[in-house]
């Protein structure tokens, strides 16, 4: 396992803990599909730590009362196409 996989594992574990314990208490609040936590999880699973962190921060900043929300997938890796499997996610873990 590379050092970057280990580094990416830290936010992945934190996001999963948030989704398991905190998100159910807060209720659905994300305007986007996938939800912000799903987006962040996918970003860290797909991209390097720094790019995933940037994508996650930028997404959270855009998830505000003034945004319309909607479908906003994680960008694919360079040279690949976006999978449609995450588009149909109906989870409301924000």
From Swiss-Prot:
Positions of region (Disordered): 72-94
Q: Which InterPro entries match?
A: Membr_insert_effic_factor_YidD (IPR002696)
Q: Where in the cell is it found?
A: Cell inner membrane
What membrane topology was assigned to this protein in its record? Peripheral membrane protein
Keywords carried by this UniProt record: Cell inner membrane, Cell membrane, Membrane
Q: Name one GO cellular component term.
A: plasma membrane
User: What functional role does this protein have?
Assistant: Could be involved in insertion of integral membrane proteins into the membrane.
Q: What PANTHER family does the record point to?
A: MEMBRANE PROTEIN INSERTION EFFICIENCY FACTOR-RELATED
Q: Could you say which protein family the record assigns here? A: Belongs to the UPF0161 family.
The protein's name is Putative membrane protein insertion efficiency factor
* Organism of origin: Chlorobium chlorochromatii (strain CaD3)
> Species lineage, top-down?
Bacteria, Pseudomonadati, Chlorobiota, Chlorobiia, Chlorobiales
